[in-house]
């Protein structure tokens, strides 16, 4: 409510706009750096965002950061940035639903989700076991054992929907088989991951009420999606969309934001709300919503980079000392193996050809932003400690940064046989 009252204060509104402009400039700098390093631009946005807070604090002190982004101003900026991400994901989820409507494809998606969820959970259990066996009290902390083990396992199993969505869009893979399979599986993992996260926090607090609350939130989201689908199929809604496409786009965006924020208020993630609305939007010749969806997604895409920067600013402003390189190395290796191997085997079991399965495996290792949110939840709840959070942050950034180069490497490797075969055929014809 304080954030909404802020919008009526002209000087504060100017402060919000200035802060938002500065954050978008930070995102632009991150994108430029990523292009120089031949990384997906979203990696640059996240890394620069992560470094922004610690750099400002180190150079100018915490008071300077608080003055530049006081609580009420930062809350409004974060809300605007989150709205951009929600609108951007509505378009991607709608595209995903249009391509993944068949039974066999959906079954394959579930196999990918299983492969990219269960093995990483097991590697997370192994990492937690290594911490316990090492008797590293700084990394272990004093949280209840079940809560600690489950939280580490969940942290290793995350795939970041927002970051993957940006990578797919930047590389033109949104409509590819690998891209749609990976994004659909990531949405399933996201839903399961948030339930497991709630369970871990509940175990840490000594109560399971939060789990039941999360199940209820998912049911609420499903009901909202069904209501949206029914409403958009009515004659009045179709007529409005055909006659006033801009008005229809504004109303569609408002509905998506309402459902997403309601899901977050109920303890889930706004990403799920956006995905549910995008999947619920009717498709086909009798449902003229494509133009409105495109407008909504483009508007969100302009603000989505700010979300990565805003979230990154809040993550690395605490103390993360006493982290051993052995712990960091174990987290990185186990993170790569669990997601990569599990994602590949799941894709092959789901009927995907080796070429698609390799790309799915690479994409499922995209953690990035969602991992940071989960780690922040584990740290703020007292279940995870600074040292293990830092190790998992390094793991998340490393595996995510590998996504772009590995996809490029796969493209080049698969082009070589084709080029070689063409050269041989040409030489034979000349002879």
Question: Which residues make up each language-model segment?
Answer:
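The feature identifies polytopic integral membrane transport proteins across all domains of life
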Residues: 41-47, 71-76, 104-115, 134-156, ...
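Interfacial loop-to-helix junctions that mark the boundaries of transmembrane helices
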Residues: 4-15, 65-81, 111, 137-153, ...
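Hydrophobic alpha-helical transmembrane segments in multi-pass integral membrane proteins
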Residues: 57-61, 121-130, 191-202, 255-269, ...
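Flexible hinge motifs at transmembrane-helix junctions and intramembrane kinks/re-entrant loops
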Residues: 29-44, 258-272
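Membrane-interface junctions of multi-pass transporters
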Residues: 52-108, 234-247, 251-330
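Entry/N-cap segments of selected transmembrane alpha helices
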Residues: 6-8, 12-26, 71-75, 96-133, ...
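C-terminal ends of transmembrane helices
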Residues: 24-39, 87-105, 162-174, 226-240, ...
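Short helical (or helix-break) motifs at transmembrane helix termini and adjacent helical loops
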Residues: 87, 95, 123, 148-196, ...
